[in-house]
Amino acid sequence: MITDPGPAPPAAAGDPAAAAAAVHVSGLRKHYGDVVALAGVDLAIGAGEFFTLLGPSGSGKTTLLRLIAGFERPDAGRIELGGGDVTRTPPYARNVNTVFQDYALFPHMTVGQNIEYGLRVRRVPKAERREKVDRALEMVRLPGLGNRKPAQLSGGQRQRVALARAIVNEPQVLLLDEPLGALDLKLRQEMQLELLRVQREVGITFIYVTHDQEEALTMSDRIAVLNHGSIEQIGGPVEVYEWPRTPFVAGFIGVSNLIERDGHTITVRPEKLALIKDGEPEPPDAHVEPGQVRDVIYAGVLTRYVVDLDAGGELVVSRQNAEPASVATGSRVRVSWRPGQAFTIPQGPDQGSRAGEGKQ
């Protein structure tokens, strides 16, 4: 039976039911003319949680972040920070800070002056400011660079300064709007680990906006997957990847195979599949789909095989390149998976048509 759902998904990490909620939004709606940016969002984020808003362009993730920051007002709904209603509170009166993709550093100021700017506005004594700035520079691993100008730093260093400027104010919540988007791949991967380390050290609630699934899976305690102004699923990285609740989530998070069988939508990840050549034995208790290899795609550490199935549909199979590929285009093969590796996805009124959106 190919619809075996396997084991139940684990409980989401950082569930605010087990911790005080730092941020709570209910019934949040926002329109721009005829465009519905948010369609009644309900969300609770635990104190000290690294929470990611993940979705494609136009999904509403940045709008939600801007509403929490106070840069815009909702058309309906309520926003609470630490249990207090801040729905109509201006940005400067909210205990939050925001880190943007473009850093937003003052070019005429030194690194140290940029970091201490918020402290000066709050009239923190000079000696305390210096101590906090030095501590923040140590935290982001830029000790001794306080006298440099932003133009003398690399992109990664400037992003660290922007982070230090935000955390030095000790906000209740730190909002990060795709802060790594302007960095190259290697530096972006390094900064993912740095952000996670800093968040764990300071214990501040991070709300992180991105369209990058790898970033979300790498750093987050929990992830909210947004689409067309609504939340499709909230859960830990393992849960949203291994147990997607909608076709959209299955298609947007990584690569997922979706096939129709017996009136059900079946999903199975490419890395869960085995490719069996003619003459090779089939694994016991496995479900098997015969077909023909249409494409063989070399991708460095792995090779992807696109198989047209005799029963209809296609499956993408990923195999690690531990040894040379031995299956060629046009080969007859059987694709197999074990019970629990494939499961059905409930169909909503408009989900089926979106099953393939966002594949990467």
Locate predicted features:
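ABC ATPase nucleotide-binding domain helices that frame the ATP-binding cleft
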Residues: 62-65, 161
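Conserved ABC transporter NBD signature motif
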Residues: 77-85
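ABC ATPase nucleotide-binding domain
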Residues: 24, 44, 80, 334-336
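Non-catalytic connector elements of ABC transporters
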Residues: 2-6, 256, 265-360
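The feature captures the beta-strand-to-loop junction immediately N-terminal to the Walker
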Residues: 54-56
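ABC ATPase nucleotide-binding domains
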Residues: 50, 89-245
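Helix-to-loop junction immediately C-terminal to a conserved catalytic motif
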Residues: 69
